[in-house]
């Protein structure tokens, strides 16, 4: 009962997605199931951490921080799981379809021509710096909001987590990798941010889940929430949001159609999340 009283709306999203992925794996055929049983163990551990953080939550103690930040952190784990499980329904990706759409929109795909035409190692690094900044603006504006207004923070995290989870489900039924295979031809080893991004993708971001771009969706949502909270100072976040949008294409992580779709879903989920939060925040 104490857990029920302390639980917030976002906790139900985390609990559902933990169990959702676990159930999907458990109903697979035995040989396939064994390949992914580590995800079941991870999700049960995540579910346990969630319950403990809710149960142990006291005002401003360690578990209070864990409780409120855990849903956003969980997205890092669930992305890896969803992009790994994206071949359960369709063995092949829809990249050929997306590449054709991309060509219809831009003619020559932008990811093939931007870096070669600009031909600047400095701009290549700058674009990868913007792409890397995604991992900062996902957390830094939220941290400032958390320290000033926890109610608004809960609204923001609910919206972003809802967007991520529904996108992850979509990735599992519509697999796509994006033009990431072009990166080695376009960028070489680089100096700072290019090798950093190679390192990140080597550890956890193994590719997949490219359409729509959650980098674009999430950064746009962070900007929209920041605009409502910080108002005049939100332009700082806006610069990074615009930079991330350009970088997704320039750095050959996404087709143009991926990033445009990310703008649309980011805006739609911002509206949807606010509506759902206002309606259900007191129901749980």
Briefly describe each language-model feature range:
Residues 122-137, 206-225, 260:
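Membrane-interface loop-to-helix entry segments
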Residues 140-147, 216-234, 264-273:
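Membrane-interfacial alpha-helical segments at the cytosolic side of multi-pass membrane proteins
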Residues 2-6, 29-35, 54-66, 145-156, ...:
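Membrane-interface helix-boundary motifs at transmembrane edges
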Residues 81-96, 163-188:
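Transmembrane alpha-helix/helix-exit interface in multi-pass inner-membrane proteins
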Residues 178, 210, 243-269:
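Interfacial helix-loop-helix junctions of multi-pass membrane proteins
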Residues 2-42, 62-137:
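N-terminal transmembrane-helix/juxtamembrane module of multi-pass inner/ER membrane proteins
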Residues 65-72, 138-173, 237:
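Interfacial segments of alpha-helical transmembrane regions
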Residues 169-229:
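Membrane-interfacial catalytic/cofactor-binding modules of polytopic membrane enzymes
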């Amino acid at each position: 009962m104490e857990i029920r009283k302390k639980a917030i709306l976002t906790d139900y999203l985390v609990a559902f997605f933990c169990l959702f992925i676990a159930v999907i794996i458990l109903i697979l055929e035995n040989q396939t199931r064994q390949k992914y049983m580590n995800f079941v163990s991870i999700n049960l551990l995540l579910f346990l951490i969630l319950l403990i953080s809710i149960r142990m939550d006291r005002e401003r103690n360690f578990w209070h921080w864990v409780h409120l930040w855990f849903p956003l952190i969980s997205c890092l784990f669930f992305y890896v799981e969803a992009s790994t499980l994206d071949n359960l329904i369709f063995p092949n990706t829809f990249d050929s379809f997306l590449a054709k759409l991309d060509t219809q929109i831009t003619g020559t795909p932008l990811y093939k021509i931007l870096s070669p035409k600009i031909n600047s190692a400095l701009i290549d690094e700058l674009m990868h710096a913007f792409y890397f900044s995604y991992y900062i603006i996902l957390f830094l504006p939220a941290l400032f909001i958390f320290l000033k207004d926890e109610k608004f923070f809960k609204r923001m995290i609910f919206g972003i987590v809802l967007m991520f989870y529904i996108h992850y489900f979509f990735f599992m039924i519509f697999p796509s990798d994006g033009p990431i295979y072009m990166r080695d031809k376009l960028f070489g080893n680089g100096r700072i941010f290019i090798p950093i991004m190679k390192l990140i993708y080597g550890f956890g971001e193994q590719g997949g889940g490219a359409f729509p771009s959650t980098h674009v969706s999430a950064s746009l949502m962070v900007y929209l929430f920041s605009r409502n909270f910080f108002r005049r100072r939100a332009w700082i976040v806006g610069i990074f949001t615009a930079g991330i949008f350009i970088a997704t294409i320039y750095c050959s992580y996404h087709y143009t159609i991926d990033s445009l779709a990310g703008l649309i879903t980011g805006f739609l989920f911002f509206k949807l999340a606010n509506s759902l939060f206002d309606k259900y925040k007191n129901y749980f």
